[in-house]
Amino acid sequence: MMKIEQVLWDWNGTLLDDLEYSIQVRNNIFPAFHLPTLSGVEEYHRQFTFPVRLYYQRAGVTDEIFDDVAHAWMAEYERCMDTIPLHGDAVETVERFRRAGLGQTVLSASEQTMLRRQLALYGLNSRFDAVLGRGDIYAGSKEAIGREYLQSCGVPAEATVMIGDSLHDAEVA
């Protein structure tokens, strides 16, 4: 078995404890589009998937309003994103891995600029070797981004572990 050299961290839901906040954001904006709100975490888990476009489709978002819903969601999410907590042991765990000599990277489906802003809110940008987000707000797959990064670093996939909270994170791993 190959020794682990690199940790790829998911951001939303893994280091950032934004599950309840994300549900609140959806429930705040969906009524304006005559779309159903969520009753809670269980319903969210039943519906959520990647890419997020499919999650939106499951919730009744048509192609005609997808862009409007995505932009409204992003604006509402950013409005109070400085109130979202990290998971209780997130910083300590990152530090423990750093002390063990592991490379660490945030690999997120979030838009790159917003991702950097969020990490900065918690003083975390400098704790990672790289922060890899997407070039758009549509939260598509991060698999290719991760693969390209590992290739550019020369780190074999077998020496990498992905830590996340979604089925997509398991697919990326």
Question: Residue locations for each model-derived region?
Answer:
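Short, acidic loop-to-helix structural element flanking the phosphoryl-transfer center
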Residues: 78-106, 112-116, 143
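Short beta->alpha linker loops
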Residues: 47, 88-89, 110, 137, ...
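Substrate-recognition "cap/lid" segment bordering the active-site pocket of phosphatases
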Residues: 83, 113-161, 167-171
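N-terminal helical cap/lid subdomain that shapes the substrate entry/recognition surface
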Residues: 3-92
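Well-formed, non-transmembrane alpha-helical positions, independent of function
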Residues: 55, 96, 118, 171-172
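Short helix-capping segments at alpha-helix termini
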Residues: 31-37, 62, 100, 123-127, ...
